[in-house]
Amino acid sequence: MQKMESDESMHIIDIREDYEVQTGMLKGAEHIPMQTIPDHMHTFRQNEPYYIICAHGVRSEKVTGYLRDHDFEAYNVTGGMAAF
């Protein structure tokens, strides 16, 4: 979480469903629903960190693992949006 609080440019991917993001998103986050991540793999770049967020951190943990399995640098935002 410390890195997320810095001013560094970063890729935050909000994987919540459409109805969930209607309540708000983190500034600068990109919305890619969890089920569509495989369809968006071509948009991810190697050697760049991605911070994956969902409502509570459970779904984002799964997506983080999926991205890591495909050799991407990915981090789960523990606690998800509920932590904010």
Language-model features: locations:
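Short, surface-exposed ligand- or partner-binding patches at beta-edge/loop junctions that are enriched
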Residues: I53
